């Protein structure tokens, strides 16, 4: 019998049940950065107009900082106040935060941490921060964010991967993809002339994402300068491009097998999410091994409780696709919203040593963190899922012998 009473009665950091003592041991989370400026110039808005959050293209806005701060507060509410799992102030051995090497993800992590560990009476002057009246905000203690190096590009999909380029060409032979791309090309041919674009019309892809950013701050300017622009056209662009975003991460509504037998959906998932899924499962397994060894564990994971990763919409979406729940992103344009987040909670039954996990999702900047474990197909409707099922998924998606070798296979 599974843990039907889970989280009805919370005892400290775990729950009691008929199956024994089930305790939360480890949490891994990943989130999309907060709202950003556009990535490209597009009339009538140019880089000089993007003054928010330091200014420039692709930068986190002040609103985006607030979105991430709110996510940090939600994390604090769950893991500090509700579960008594994390210390109320920063403890270096308990938490580890990582980011891709872009300003918007780095500052998103910093903003989140300001919500997770805000200035408080828990922070001690001259211990957690310098006591210099009028020169330092009382209680403000910094938390490090570790930025990915060039050797960590695979998990965040930033490594060059000729195999992925090959798979994108192969997917263009699929009827589902051809139909969706035809709609994109027709829309591009409608929009490009309005910007006086005469070459590369079929690949004029810049406008949907740019409109999304522009309308947040310059909606009146757009209506004044672009007499043909309206909300219906914006929505059409978002909806038309949404299937393409799904294909790029291995999400298809029909069997995605080419005429020569290549399973494009599986192959794309392997190179796009395989490394990330395996990192998550491997880290969780090592942590739970460490818990079972107790004092004999010398791993850095010995005291670590929370591992967070500040990344991008396509990274989060790729994991949702791998889990079989891409639909929960629930956005018009397909990919997860700003400040969307996935949480993996890993539990251990101290009597049976059974390992379990839960999946939680935060849909957007105005949403709460919601348990979606029962929606994950491999969990078959249960509220707590055996870790072995996650391990099986990792084994299936693992690039063999390694991602570098797989990425260099172009046939």
Swiss-Prot record:
EC class (word): hydrolase
Keywords tagged on the record: Disulfide bond, Hydrolase
Reaction equations catalysed: a phosphate monoester + H2O = an alcohol + phosphate
Pfam families tied to this protein: His_Phos_2
Enzyme Commission code(s) on record: 3.1.3.2
GO molecular function: acid phosphatase activity; phosphatase activity
InterPro entries named in the record: Acid_Pase_AS, His_Pase_clade-2, His_PPase_superfam, Histidine_acid_phosphatase
Protein name, as recorded: Putative acid phosphatase 10
Organism: Caenorhabditis elegans
């Amino acid at each position: 019998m599974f843990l039907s009473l889970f989280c009805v009665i919370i005892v400290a950091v775990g729950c009691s049940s008929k199956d024994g003592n089930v305790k939360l041991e480890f949490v891994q989370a990943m989130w999309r950065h907060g709202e950003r400026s556009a990535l490209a110039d597009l009339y009538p808005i140019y880089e000089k107009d993007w003054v928010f959050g330091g200014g420039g293209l692709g930068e986190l806005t002040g609103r985006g900082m607030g979105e991430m701060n709110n996510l940090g507060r939600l994390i604090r509410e769950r893991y500090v106040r509700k579960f008594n799992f994390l210390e109320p102030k920063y403890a270096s051995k308990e938490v580890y935060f990582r980011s891709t090497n872009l300003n918007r993800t780095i500052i998103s992590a910093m903003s989140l941490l300001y919500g997770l560990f805000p200035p408080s009476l828990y922070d001690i002057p001259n211990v957690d921060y310098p006591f210099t009246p009028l020169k330092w905000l009382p209680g403000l203690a910094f938390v490090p964010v570790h930025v990915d190096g060039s050797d960590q590009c695979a998990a965040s999909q930033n490594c060059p991967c000729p195999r992925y380029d090959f798979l994108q060409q192969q997917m263009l032979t699929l009827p589902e993809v051809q139909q969706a791309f035809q709609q994109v090309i027709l829309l591009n041919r409608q929009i490009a002339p309005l910007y006086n674009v005469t070459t590369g019309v079929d690949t004029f892809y810049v406008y949907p994402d740019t409109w999304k950013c522009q309308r947040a701050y310059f909606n009146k300017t757009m209506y004044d300068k672009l007499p043909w622009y309206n909300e219906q056209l914006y929505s059409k662009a978002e909806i038309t491009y949404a299937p393409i975003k799904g294909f790029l991460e291995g999400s298809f509504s029909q069997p995605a097998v080419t005429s020569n037998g290549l399973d494009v959906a599986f192959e794309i998932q392997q190179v796009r999410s395989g490394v990330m899924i395996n990192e998550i499962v491997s880290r969780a397994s090592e942590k739970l091994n460490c818990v079972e060894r107790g004092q004999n564990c010398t791993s850095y994971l010995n005291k670590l409780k929370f591992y967070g990763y500040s990344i991008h919409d396509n990274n989060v979406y790729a994991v949702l696709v791998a889990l079989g729940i891409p639909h929960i992103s629930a956005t018009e344009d397909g990919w997860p919203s700003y400040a969307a987040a996935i949480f993996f909670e890993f539990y251990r039954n101290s009597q049976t040593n059974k390992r379990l996990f839960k999946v939680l999702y935060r849909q957007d900047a105005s949403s709460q963190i919601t348990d979606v474990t029962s929606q994950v197909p491999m969990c078959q409707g249960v509220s707590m899922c055996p870790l072995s099922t996650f391990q099986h998924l990792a084994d299936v998606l693992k690039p063999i012998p390694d991602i570098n070798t797989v990425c260099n296979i172009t046939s």
